[in-house]
Design a protein with these regions (language model features):
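Glycine-rich beta-strand-centered segment in the early N-terminal region that forms part
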Residues: 37-54, 62-102
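NAD(P)H dinucleotide-binding glycine-rich loop of Rossmann-like/cofactor-binding domains
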Residues: 61, 98-160
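C-terminal hydrophobic helical "lid"/dimerization subdomain
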Residues: 3-15, 268-315
């Protein structure tokens, strides 16, 4: 389907583009920089010229049924074309968002995205910093507020408080007026404190359930043994929410929820506001050019990262 394009002299739709594509299920070694067609627009879609695309640790395992596939589901860029009859987005808008997981992603010069999933990006930060927000920050928002029902004044325990999702959860819970208890270890203990946690438990030194006072909400970002042990620290009527794996069933007086993050324009708008106010700070670990996507995906598997690994597509 055709669309409304940028004004004459500003942009001409190319027939092809560079895109990173996964050609097999063996990880970063099966990534290739290919020349492919620029995607056509469906109803309600916009074409975004990608400036930066963030990547996630396990995402190369997601598209095994539709290879070759373009990875990266977080984009920051500029709208260059909109579908006929589409309202709400204009050519030249700087936007960011979480793209659908069941189609090609943003590790390319252009990506077609349903306009309802895009929002104006935070203009106080760079495109790579904008791209670092959607997946992790939406996961944090939905875990705390949509599934966790966190209210001001409540106590929340965040497992992995300085990690990819945890760093946003710590900042959002603090901004919301909750009492934030975080778990971390090593250098991440100091980072969790700097993010605004009221208390930080060094799990390399103590078991969290031995030292934490009862909490209203546990938000788990990593799964495993800490999640299994979490019901014991919840107050009656407490909530256990995990974005990592199905939580254990605790006493009938608590609720346990596992969720998968969903795109949300409304939530992105609020995240943009918080970033531009300086109340939510995205972290970027490293930036790689599109041609070095293999190195970027190898970096995302390494330990010791602080923040997102991002592909820079256009300056």
């Amino acid at each position: 389907m055709g669309g409304n394009q940028a004004r004459d002299g500003e942009w001409t739709r190319p027939s092809s583009m560079r895109a990173v594509r996964l050609h097999g299920g063996d990880g970063a070694g099966r990534l290739e920089l290919d020349t492919v067609s620029v995607p056509d627009l469906g109803a309600g879609e916009s074409l975004v010229r990608v400036h930066a695309a963030a990547i996630t640790r396990d995402e190369l395992e997601w598209p095994v049924d539709r290879l070759p596939a373009i990875p990266s589901y977080e984009a920051s860029g500029v709208v260059v074309e909109v579908a006929e009859g589409l309202d709400g987005l204009e050519i030249g808008d700087e936007v960011y968002g979480l793209t659908p997981f069941d189609r090609d992603g943003a590790a390319a010069e252009y990506v077609a995205v349903p306009a309802a999933l895009l929002a104006p990006r935070p203009r106080s930060v760079t495109h790579p910093e904008s791209a670092a927000v959607p997946l992790a920050a939406l996961s944090a928002w939905q875990g705390l507020f949509v599934h966790g029902g966190l209210a001001a004044g409540e106590r929340v325990l965040i497992h992995g408080a300085a990690g990819g999702v945890g760093q946003f959860a710590t900042q959002l819970a603090r901004e919301h007026g909750a009492h934030v208890v975080g778990t971390a270890s090593g250098e991440a203990v100091a980072r969790a404190r700097a993010l605004g946690a009221d208390e930080v438990i060094d799990v390399g030194v103590a078991r969290f359930e031995d030292v934490v006072e009862p909490v209203d909400l546990v938000f788990d970002t990593a799964g495993g043994d800490p999640l299994t042990r979490s019901p014991s620290v919840l107050r009656e009527g407490g909530r256990l929410v995990s974005v990592a794996e199905e939580p254990p069933h605790g006493p009938p007086t608590i609720t346990a929820t596992y969720f998968v993050v969903e795109p949300s324009r409304e939530q992105l708008l609020e995240l943009t506001r918080l970033v531009d106010k300086g109340n939510l700070v995205p972290a970027v670990d490293s930036v790689f050019p599109l041609a070095e996507a293999r190195s970027a995906f190898e970096r995302v598997q390494e330990s010791g990262k602080h923040g997102k690994v991002v592909l820079l597509v256009h300056e």
